Amino acid sequence: MAIINMSDLDLQGKRVLIREDLNVPVSNGVVTSDARLRASLPTIELALAKGAAVMVMSHLGRPTEGEYNSEFSMQPVVDYLAKALSCPVRLATDYLDGVEVAVGEVVVFENVRFNKGEKKNDEALSKKMAALCDVYVMDAFGTAHRAEASTNGVGLYAPIACAGPLLAQELDALGKALDNPARPLVAIVGGSKVSTKLTVLESLSGIVDQLVVGGGIANTFIAAAGHNVGKSLYEADLIDEAKRLVANAQSRGGDIPVPTDVVVAGEFSPTAAATLKAVSDVGDSDMIFDIGPDSAEALAKIIESAGTIVWNGPVGVFEFDQFGEGTKRIAHAIADSKAFSIAGGGDTLAAVDKYGIADKVSYISTGGGAFLEFLEGKELPAVAMLKKRGA
């Protein structure tokens, strides 16, 4: 079941409709973080270089579906692309019944969520979108886990549906990390709650050699090991689940190591005083906000010997510097490792930026929810659609 790649197609004179993930933060009509826009430029430029008439669509924010709201307009994205691309770029507000687009220009459709039926993957809407193009390109990994009209339905009805370079790259990198990884395979999963990442932890505990947990998730594992976690965020109802995951990992010769030392404070604030304690010495009024240096060093050693590293989530409240040393040590260990490394998820990318290691990570995933669902072993709806159309 091969997926068709846009880079292999002849697009000369073709009407090409590209679904990108251009959902960027906007303040006072100006894009404030352009990472996703920069990531999409090579795909748009390739379509132009191949002689296509290019149309681009995306959602932006969470407007009420079916209603225009200037706060969520794509205009700031159009302004950005007009500066970044050496061709005319314009916004199309009413496009579903047809749009004029010339070879060598880019027409950006207004926010797809202004269309009623977008999120429900409405068939009539999908067919209208499909009728606008000769070739549909799905390039938005960040929304590949959602079956919506602009990410899924349109691809079922377009004359040709293919993967854009960004999506293809993403699937290649994730496949390399999970389908046939160089061992040992080490996964680092952070975040505040076990419940939100339970299926990821279950899926990974069955394939990785070492599963490292951090953040609030680690607190539940610390409690499962019989230690006091004081007033820390943890999930008492998932302690048995945590014990089962540890037993599962150990039965395969792996492990989920619990921190031996932690950094605690009496309150959650940027000015809270940090205190280093052995994990067995956590008091009733303590809150755990980071792993200690001994634990960080032990994890760094695990990372140093890895063949493949998957990183999703920090191991402490790194936004506050006094609770950031654990995440910083792990970030630098990943940067120094010779392993194939992949990082994904919003907080993880913020940590990658903060510690300046972007160029030392083998692949940085653009997807949050999609990255997690891939780690869970789920087939993403957009990928299933592309496989179906490539068959």
Curated annotation (Swiss-Prot):
Its main location: cytoplasm. Keywords: ATP-binding, Cytoplasm, Glycolysis, Kinase, Nucleotide-binding, Transferase. It comes from the Bacteria. Substrate binds at residues 21-23, 36, 59-62, 113, 146. Coiled coil: none annotated. It is found in: Cytoplasm. It catalyses: (2R)-3-phosphoglycerate + ATP = (2R)-3-phospho-glyceroyl phosphate + ADP. PROSITE patterns: PGLYCERATE_KINASE (PS00111). Pathway: Carbohydrate degradation; glycolysis; pyruvate from D-glyceraldehyde 3-phosphate: step 2/5. Its EC number is 2.7.2.3. GO terms for cellular component: cytosol. GO terms for biological process: gluconeogenesis; glycolytic process. The keyword Kinase applies. It is an enzyme of class 2 (transferase). Belongs to the phosphoglycerate kinase family. Monomer. This is Phosphoglycerate kinase. It comes from Shewanella oneidensis (strain ATCC 700550 / JCM 31522 / CIP 106686 / LMG 19005 / NCIMB 14063 / MR-1). The lineage of its organism: Bacteria, Pseudomonadati, Pseudomonadota, Gammaproteobacteria, Alteromonadales. The gene is pgk.
